Amino acid sequence: MPKIKTNRGAAKRFKPTGSGGFKRAQSHRRHILTKKSTKRKRHLRSTGMIAECDKASVRQMLPHV
């Protein structure tokens, strides 16, 4: 039986929380930032939580977390 492997892309994107959820970063903050307002970029710095419906998929990709 082969070992269960962690999806490395998901491991870099999601961090588990104590209550069983996963933290995630906001998108749209890598490039083409000159046309985006300071307020918009500031709000994109904050972290978010993944949706409840995606929790099972992320948990399957991160079996050892």
UniProtKB/Swiss-Prot annotation:
Similarity field: Belongs to the bacterial ribosomal protein bL35 family.
Gene that encodes the chain: rpmI
GO annotation terms (biological process): translation
Keyword Ribosomal protein: yes
Cellular-component GO terms for this entry: cytosolic large ribosomal subunit
Composition bias, Basic residues: 25-45
Source organism of this protein record: Thioalkalivibrio sulfidiphilus (strain HL-EbGR7)
UniProt name for this protein: Large ribosomal subunit protein bL35
MF terms (GO), sorted A to Z: structural constituent of ribosome
Chain positions covered by the region annotation Disordered: 1-46
PROSITE patterns the UniProt entry points to: RIBOSOMAL_L35
NCBIfam families to which the protein is assigned, alphabetical: rpmI_bact
This protein's UniProt keywords: Ribonucleoprotein, Ribosomal protein
UniProt-listed PANTHER family: 54S RIBOSOMAL PROTEIN BL35M, LARGE RIBOSOMAL SUBUNIT PROTEIN BL35M
